[in-house]
Amino acid sequence: MKKHISLVLLILFLSASSLFAQEGFHLLTTMSGDSIGDQFSVVSHIGDINADGFDDVIVGAPGGDYAKLFFGGAVFDTIPDLIFKDYKQLNCYFGCAITGDGDINGDGYPDIIIGASDTWIGPSFPFEIMTTGAAYVYFGGPMIDTTADLTLIVGDWLTQTGWYYEFGSSVAIPGDLNGDGYDDFVIGAANDDYDAHGRVYIYYGGPNVDDQYDVLLEGEDVFDNFGFSLSAVGDMNNDGFDDVLIGAPMFHNNIPNKIYQGGKAYLVYGGNEINLTNSIEFTGDTSSYQYGRFISGLGDVNGDSINDLGIMGGEYFKIISGYDFYPVLTVYADTNKFGSYYNIAAANDINNDVYNDIFVGMQEAINNEAFNSIFVYYGGVTIDSIPDLEITQEANSFFQSAGFLGNINNDDYIDYILGAQDWYGGVTPGASRVNIYFFGLPDDVQEDINSIYLSNFILYQNYPNPFNSTTIIKYSIPKQEQVTLKIYDQLGRLVTTLVDVEKNVGQHQVEFHTDKLASGVYFYQLIAGNIILTNKLILLK
């Protein structure tokens, strides 16, 4: 049975003043996209892909058509171990959706699925079917590589099917839907053909899993966008089959002229036969819009031993009890501030009180700028509408996704990854970034950090990154050592030496400031004794 739920949400930075003031999230590291427009911010919980005992991290960058996999370790670094791409096609939006933490071929290792919703198929331009989409399956294990084990495409040039499907725009591994002992996987094509009623394709896992879908579910009406969102939820009705939650945010609720889309979500039950007849429907309020755009299986948030659901519309969200499918909480945004909600995700049990918790993203418009926050609602027997934590963001930074990582460095703290897109002037996407946090009390956190400092050489990701003129580079050494820290360009030419002196045990930092260098990628290298560590930094002017 699935224990971990794929998460979809958006986040960026915690302010430095709140980072260590109380029990809360503490920044472990920051990672950024390679270039402006990469949208490096799509994340998902994937588990221990390479079976080395550490949970791993994956981040998609659909604007740059890549996804980076970072193996966990006692010292987590920000140099990717594998980079996934579709090397045959550019601008295919590879990395727009990612899922993992399910073993679809039964080899004992969790697998990864990556969507590329804008993939074209056909002989060559202009004889191609536009944005039919694709999804790629990579089997986990110690020998995982960047060659897809399965390539999934449902469009066909000869029959001229697949126009505008955007297959792969949503992906999920919801568990064992048909009860055969293997995890199954689900791919959405919400914009299918010309009418956008939406489709969801279900593939049954197994030792001989292939690229042919086993079940096709379709939206009820035109423009429903059925399959826009997908989420694993576990076995909601305790019948031995896992289930799946599907969003149709443009469902029109019988509103005249179909102008205002109330939206809908479907809890589709697994079983020997899977169809929409055997499902529970959650219909949005006719006074609002796009209910089901963001959905999440939340785990058990109220302590009744039954998994619960989160379903969000543009101006409100509901926490749905898995016991009777009635809302246990409904919260509306402040429309006077042009407020709207922008994602919901499971957070597992952040504060260790045995109740699962909830991430909620919200944005408001203030003085012609968009501001984002992430709210944390602690689970409990009763849950009220007042968030327990609020994390505010920089202007024009928009939450993209969030994930429960597990423990990527075995430091006794659960880690979380939170990604966001930067938008310049509200219209141009930036390189974007993700932060990895762990949660705890300041004294406990500092004690654990000190123990890490005293046992490892560590070169941290510079902050901020990308940067304009000035950035901070931190490093720690476990013994007194002669240290050099140098900056190089992409050709390996020395730019400057920041440190060349003997340093004592502990954490150190240095400021790198430049007004003369051109925008681009540079490298900083730490040498301490026979230890050499290198990281990348990005200068944007």
Predicted regions mapped to residue ranges:
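Positively charged, lysine/arginine-rich intrinsically disordered segments
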Residues: 445-449
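Bacterial N-terminal signal peptides
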Residues: 8-17
